[in-house]
A protein has these predicted regions:
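Conserved P-loop NTPase motor module
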Residues: 1-9, 16, 20-21, 27-35, ...
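Conserved P-loop NTPase motor cores
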Residues: 11-133, 159
Length: 182
């Protein structure tokens, strides 16, 4: 595995194996990063909440938290994402999710429902105006949080970039079939 980029895709995995598969993939990624002594490494983990959420195993959650801290301690980058903040704070009073957030210097908060924005308000020191703003963001807008500095940002893409990264079901269907619904 000497490639610059290694992707472990679990998208076709049966639902009852997702947690085990995610743990396996995360463990492999961690081992690879630990063996890259002279190079900066980055772990980009989408939906890692499955290992720290309500139905997760505390040992797996502890492994994820320790992994994020270790990667950061080595000067690497650990990027995690979730569409539901509640998931991160469901296991054992949210200690694992809070630990992951605390280990992350930079946080990007995209649009979310008020209940979820309130859940992270104290953890990220968000003002009432920032909570309100988060609930009103449109696609491509977010709040960049670095320590106590919070800056609203907007991402703009070229058509080529949008086509490469879109997750819009409508746009993906058009891309796949070449047809626009009437």
């Amino acid at each position: 595995l000497n490639n610059k980029y290694i992707v472990l895709d679990l998208s076709g995995m049966p639902d009852d194996m997702i947690a085990d598969g995610t743990f396996w993939a995360t463990s492999i990624a961690y081992d690879l990063i630990m063996n890259c002594e002279d190079e900066l490494s980055a772990l980009l983990a989408d939906e890692l909440w499955s290992l720290v959420g309500a139905t997760a195993n505390p040992q797996a959650a502890g492994f994820v938290l320790e992994m994020v801290k270790t990667i950061r301690g080595l000067g690497g980058i650990a990027v995690t994402s979730t569409q539901g903040m509640q998931d991160l704070f469901s296991l054992e009073g949210g200690s694992y999710g809070k630990g992951i957030l605390d280990s992350s210097r930079i946080k990007l908060v995209m649009q979310m429902e008020e209940q979820e924005a309130r859940l992270i308000q104290d953890k990220l020191n968000l003002s009432e105006d920032e909570v309100r703003q988060i609930t009103r963001f449109r696609r491509g807008e977010g709040l960049l949080c670095i320590g106590y500095n919070h800056v609203p940002i907007a991402f703009h893409t070229t058509p080529k970039e949008y086509e490469a990264i879109t997750t819009s079901p409508t746009d993906l269907r058009i891309k796949r079939t070449g047809q626009i619904d009437e």
